[in-house]
């Protein structure tokens, strides 16, 4: 049976992990959210989240966006390529309801899978 846990090993934790992704990213985005990805040598995907207070004013909205993004990643982790991902929330993402945000994330994960197969 496939485990769908979200352990510490699946998270980008240090600034150097984020910098690694920002140096040469593959980009997939919508007007409200961008996912940057870069292949890693670990054999499994990892995720980091950036939701700036400048773009999403209210803490409960930032938390909702992060929670939905983590859940989307957790459910797709076994389908994703071994990449480090940084999810960047842009202005307007707080206006999306949960379903629209989940659908946008699914579309971006599929795009990253295609990009990884193509490289």
Swiss-Prot record:
Keyword Translocase: no
Top EC category: hydrolase
EC number: 3.1.26.5
Any one GO BP annotation for this protein: tRNA 5'-leader removal
Assigned keywords, A-Z: Endonuclease, Hydrolase, Nuclease, RNA-binding, tRNA processing
Gene Ontology cellular component list: ribonuclease P complex
Function: RNaseP catalyzes the removal of the 5'-leader sequence from pre-tRNA to produce the mature 5'-terminus. It can also cleave other RNA substrates such as 4.5S RNA. The protein component plays an auxiliary but essential role in vivo by binding to the 5'-leader sequence and broadening the substrate specificity of the ribozyme.
Family: Belongs to the RnpA family.
This protein's name: Ribonuclease P protein component
Source species of the chain: Klebsiella pneumoniae (strain 342)
Organism taxonomic ancestry: Bacteria, Pseudomonadati, Pseudomonadota, Gammaproteobacteria, Enterobacterales
Encoding gene per record: rnpA
